[in-house]
């Protein structure tokens, strides 16, 4: 198995940024904050007040800013439907998203838990059961976002693959293009749609 190096504090914040959050959100005084190194895509900080904990997420390069309102509304809606997920916090103006260090950020509630490197069969069952609850609950939400990882985006991904991939197998890129053509040609258009994770 391959280990991924986790360095998820790309953007460093300071006391001025913390003061901005205290001033613009109804959290109370922030007593402590520190970066969370576990993760790979965005910068995350654990923020502690006297009685509560929050997560500050600073969105980094790969995130499409236009998609963020969808995710804020999804988490908020799921939370209201009793799905255990982070709930985004609105600022005093009623807005979820704000800027820190010229990057979009948000605050969400903290969920207790710990990471698991291996799951038992029983734990896998519980995960599946909770994902099913998420799927059912999300049908009640009137939210839609085009799937940026579906078959329609695979051409773009394939075009980014350098011809050096042919070192793995002769004409691999060409055969991948042929396979993708067949997949797209036979892709069913009437599949059910819904929120997935």
In which residue ranges do the predicted regions lie?
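A cross-family kinase active-site recognition segment
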Residues: 118-173, 191-193
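Generic structural marker for isolated residues within well-ordered, non-membrane alpha-helices
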Residues: 18, 75, 180
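Short Pro/Gly-enriched beta-strand edge/turn motifs at strand-loop
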Residues: 23-31, 176-186
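Juxta-kinase regulatory segment immediately upstream of eukaryotic protein kinase catalytic domains
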Residues: 2-29
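Asparagine-rich low-complexity intrinsically disordered tracts
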Residues: 1-5, 159, 178
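Protein kinase glycine-rich loop
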Residues: 34-38
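Active-site acidic catalytic loop and adjacent metal/ATP-binding pocket
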Residues: 40-50, 55-56, 88, 181-197
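ATP-binding pocket architecture of kinase catalytic cores
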Residues: 49-143
């Amino acid at each position: 198995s391959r280990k991924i190096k986790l360095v998820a504090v790309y953007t460093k914040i300071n006391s001025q940024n913390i003061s901005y959050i205290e001033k613009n959100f109804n959290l109370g005084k922030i007593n402590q904050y520190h970066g969370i190194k576990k993760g790979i895509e965005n910068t995350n900080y654990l923020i502690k007040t006297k009685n509560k904990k929050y997560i500050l997420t600073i969105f980094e390069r790969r995130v499409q800013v236009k998609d963020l309102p969808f995710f804020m509304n999804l988490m908020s809606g799921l939370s209201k439907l009793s799905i255990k997920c982070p709930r985004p916090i609105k600022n005093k103006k009623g807005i979820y998203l704000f800027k820190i260090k010229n990057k979009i950020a948000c605050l969400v509630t903290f969920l207790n838990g710990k990471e698991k490197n291996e799951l038992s069969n029983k734990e896998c069952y519980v995960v599946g059961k909770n994902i099913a609850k998420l799927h059912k609950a999300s049908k009640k939400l009137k939210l839609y976002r085009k799937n940026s990882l579906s078959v329609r985006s695979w051409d773009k991904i394939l075009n980014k693959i350098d011809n050096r991939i042919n070192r793995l197998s002769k004409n691999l890129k060409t055969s991948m293009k042929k396979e993708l053509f067949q997949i797209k040609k036979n892709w069913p258009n009437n599949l059910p749609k819904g929120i997935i994770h």
